[in-house]
A protein has these predicted regions:
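Short, cationic motifs built from Arg/Lys/His that form the positively charged side of catalytic pockets
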Residues: 80-83, 87, 167-168, 178, ...
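Basic DNA-binding region of bZIP-type proteins
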Residues: 165, 173-192
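Residues immediately within or flanking Cys/His clusters that coordinate Zn2+
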Residues: 146-151, 167, 172, 178
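Short helix-coil boundary/hinge micro-motifs
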Residues: 1-148, 152-159, 193-201
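Short linker/helix segments within small regulatory modules
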Residues: 160-167
Length: 201
């Protein structure tokens, strides 16, 4: 996956979250969504390509880039665990991360800006970048706008841009209508038969 190819979020047709929070959104959207797109963390090859592209897009990495590396099966386990941990955090669940302490660095740019930059190499650097962006989003009050679609088969990560932060679907027409239709059918079944069911043929 190159920088010009769609991100894990872009392949779903979902708008990217602002600034570095997009990195967190992209991690969450690496999963298989209803069998429509593959899990990008399913193999070492796909995970390695995806990680390189993601870190190259990250604001703290744009000046120097990142050398390619080959993640191991153990690295894949760590990346999937990281994805589960961030997902649990968005669900409001207790999180027991594999790495309770993650390193990051404060970098001063020539222009005088101070940035929180990821530390380490490979998957460790990616984990550092993810938690750094979660921290920054929590500090600037944008974390509450990153959500998982309430349609369980989807669960895509999206950034809620509504004024009152009331969005629950990544796309109302796609997932909102589908869930409402299922709920309507369930209510009708509970009260009797659906239209056209149980009638003489």
């Amino acid at each position: 996956m190159s920088q010009t190819e769609p991100t894990s979020t872009g392949r779903l047709g979902i708008a990217a979250a602002p600034a570095g929070l997009r990195l967190v959104q992209d991690l969450l959207n690496t999963r298989d969504v209803g069998g429509k797109v593959p899990d990008l963390l399913a193999s070492t090859d796909s995970a390695g390509d995806w990680l390189i592209a993601e870190l190259a897009r990250h604001p703290a990495e744009t000046s120097g880039g990142v050398d390619r590396f080959d993640p191991t099966e153990a690295d894949l386990d760590d990346l999937r665990a990281l994805r589960r941990e961030v997902s649990a955090l968005l669900h409001g669940e207790d999180v027991a991360p594999r790495e309770p302490a993650v390193s990051a660095s404060l970098v001063i740019t020539p222009g005088g800006d101070v940035r929180l930059a990821p530390a380490g190499t490979g998957p460790q650097r990616f984990s550092s970048a993810i938690w750094a962006e979660v921290f920054l989003a929590q500090q600037n009050d944008t974390w509450r706008r990153l959500k998982l679609c309430r349609n369980a088969p989807c669960s895509s990560a999206f950034y809620d841009r509504s004024k009152n932060n009331s969005g629950v679907w990544h796309d109302v027409k796609v997932c909102g209508n589908a869930v409402n239709l299922r709920a309507s059918r369930a209510r009708r079944r509970a009260g009797g038969t659906l239209p056209g069911e149980g009638q003489p043929r």
